[in-house]
A protein has these predicted regions:
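Glycine-rich phosphate-binding loop plus the immediately following alpha-helix
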Residues: 1-42
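Short hydrophobic/aromatic-enriched beta-strand-loop microsegments
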Residues: 2-4, 115-125
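Conserved active-site and cofactor/substrate-binding residues in soluble primary-metabolism enzymes
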Residues: 4, 8, 48, 70-81, ...
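Adenine-nucleotide phosphate-binding core of ATP-dependent small-molecule kinases
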Residues: 42-85
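Non-transmembrane, aqueous-exposed alpha-helical and coiled segments at domain scale
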Residues: 87-93
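Glycine-rich phosphate-binding loops at beta-strand->alpha-helix junctions
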Residues: 93-111
């Protein structure tokens, strides 16, 4: 069993590191080219994570990348590494089910799709309601 602090690391880098000036706070979508590029870099074991972090800074200073593209790249880079690590030892399942908030599950779904995995997304709120309803019916029926 593995778990990852990907979201925590992204938040720390975005809010408390030298990169905070190079990263936009607004959300980007999973189809953003910089996000897709970041995921692909994350899948590659040839680019170390710390090198990628420096590239975010360098892209901002030298290429004048916009902060939204930098945030999308960094998010994709971190998610790409997480997905690569997570699926490395998993058999190819028929389908991976993602449960959670819409914007985050879309990012994971895109990364998993790029890793050639079939994905189905489920809204977390709906499943919690269904689970609580089933528990109530079990207890009080």
């Amino acid at each position: 069993f593995d778990t990852y602090l990907t979201g925590e690391l992204f938040s720390i880098l975005r809010q408390h590191s030298i990169l905070k000036h190079d990263l936009e706070a607004e959300e980007f979508n999973a189809e953003h080219p910089a996000f897709v590029n970041g995921v692909e870099v994350g899948f590659s074991e040839s680019t170390p994570l710390l090198t990628s972090l420096f590239r975010v800074r360098a892209r901002s200073l030298l290429i004048e990348r916009d902060p939204l593209a930098n945030a999308a790249f960094l998010s994709g880079r971190l998610l790409g590494e997480e997905v690569r690590s997570a699926i490395k030892n998993l058999p190819k399942m028929e389908k991976i089910h993602l449960v959670g908030g819409s914007s985050l599950t879309k990012l994971y779904a895109k990364a998993l799709t790029l890793a050639e995995r079939e994905v189905q997304q489920h809204p977390g709120d709906d499943l919690v309601r269904l689970g609580l309803t089933a528990a109530w019916q079990f207890l009080y029926s």
